[in-house]
Amino acid sequence: VKRSEVSINFGTRRKIKQADIDSLFYMASEKAKDSSVEVVSVNPISYIIDDGRVTLEPIGENALSITANLSIIYADKKFIEMFNTIVAGLDYSSVEYISEPLAQALFIIPKERREDLALLIDVGDLTSSISFVKGDGLYALTSFSRGGGFITNDLADAFDISINEADKLKRQIVLSVKGKQS
């Protein structure tokens, strides 16, 4: 995941159209080109209208210029090529690549919460990821090799119990961070 900022100056004040947003996305994709990776998606973090207004929905706004802060998600070209070959061998005509952390965030975190920087922590069995989400894009993403399976093993070792017993114990533990109430 990388962030990119691109702008368009219209020359005269006019309404922003979908074609302008498409142009911003294209500019960011071109700017991000790299021989070893492929752009999987470009998503808006925010748009800034020339008068300084920040929005997630610029279409229809009057502006002289627009700046887009965009999230660009990449995948390794070798990975894409390998799966495209597999999919073609299964007689599928196309495949869509998506970012699982972004899809989770857009589904789980309400749009209003994503206007400010939101955080989604996904603890898997072996790995965990932390997604910082703003607007409809990933602001940052980090993953590390430490998941629930490691906690289960640590509990089994610490209390000298079986993995099944440790897993049951782990599922009874509630970890939470108390945030400010809105």
Regions found by a protein language model. Name each.
Residues T152:
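Generic structural marker for isolated residues within well-ordered, non-membrane alpha-helices
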Residues L120-T127, V133-D136, S145-G149:
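A short acidic Gly-Thr/Ser loop motif
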